[in-house]
Amino acid sequence: VKVIGSVGSQEKIEETKLNGCIETFISNDEKFSKKVLDVTNGKGVDIVFDSVGNDTFESSLSSLAHCGYLINFGQSSGPVQPVLMSTLAEKSLSISRPILFHYFGNRKNYEKMAASVFKAFEDEIIKVSEFLPFDLKDASNAHETLESRKGGGSIYLSLIHI
């Protein structure tokens, strides 16, 4: 599997390469789709995982190969506008909008999925970037960091220093 990364700023590119991306582009670059097509020799990618939503949706669709699959699993920039079926038909594209909680149908499935994720952490298949702790009293700063997409790591509120 070859992965092309998408980030919100130049500062995050190096981390994606350390985590195995063969190439990484800034998501709001107006030439994003063209760069993806260039890297794939004009084919496009088979799958796009898009957590941003409205701001990246069109470039995500444009980056797909024929019979490609777009998985929109978040909409941090706002909801995606309706898509015409004829747009999908141009390249026989598929789209899904999974909701994580729908996959937790029963306790057994939940435990199995959780175990596989924890195993991926143990085996360093999933690598954890830096953690950014904020005191609870600084929750507004944590939200600003999260909303600005400049955190670059996991943000959490600490109750220890109250």
Show which residues each predicted segment covers.
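Terminal helix/beta-alpha structural elements that buttress the NAD(P)+-binding lobe
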Residues: 1-159
